[in-house]
Amino acid sequence: MPEYYPFKSHQAKEQYLNYYDQRAQEWPVYSESKLVETSFGKTYVRISGPSNGSPLVLLPSTSASSLVWMPTIEALSEHYRVYAVDNIYDYGRSVNTQNIKNSADMTNWLDDLFTALDLGDSINLMGLSFGGWLTSQYTLDHPKRLRKSIWLAPAATIYNFPGEWAWRGILSAIPHRYFMKKFMLEWLFADLLQKNDESSIKLMNELVDDAMMGLNCYSFRMPITPSVLTDNELQSIKISTLFLVGENEKLYPAKKAVERLNTIAPQIQTEIIPKAGHDLTIVQTELVNSMVLDFLMLDDPKD
């Protein structure tokens, strides 16, 4: 691998990391960072919250980094020791040194990371979109390490991607703002777009900036495609699990996803977030935070 991997060049690496560090200055609470060695490479972790708080690990969506949690981190880190992770096989400051081929590699990487961070066997794990799917996979593979599992609008996991996902993904990979914004972000984040106020417009532009910076600076890596869990897999989950989805979710019909879980795996708690889609953590931040914290604090040993 070249010295500048996973970037396209030394210049691209410098450009992206400068942009990333500038965006990171907007993190709204005190944090410290660690670059953690694992058998799959170096993982960058942003840590916030009380040092004696129960561990809460956050996994980002695809084509994003730990910074995707900026809207929610203030509330989450008030009581929990929050570890916001840069996916080792996506954008951010993490760098894989071993090939990542499938979900097992991803969950083994996470297990290495949790051991290196000395998080013990009572971890709260939460993921958004791709991170939600990865959370479900870790829940299946390493349930004894988890206390609670939270899936926020998980990609696939419950329902297959819609047919339009493929062509939207192809068009949004064209390195121009118009295609990324028009065919992917404005579609996924339609509720944010509809707000059309100054802060929402600014946030949408930042999301486009983030995506384009990664697209322009990173070399192509074969993506890991999220899968749909089988009935048996969903039924096998015994630890306390929460599934949150926006009523206007574009990746799958929210009501049908909830119906499947309620029928096949009623032990998984489900909630539909009103007036939100895949942007639920952005347009309904307070409601999502409230539901997540209520779920986490229920039967918390520190309560």
Residue ranges and their predicted role:
Residues A84-M126, S290:
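Active-site loop/oxyanion-hole signature of alpha/beta-hydrolase fold enzymes
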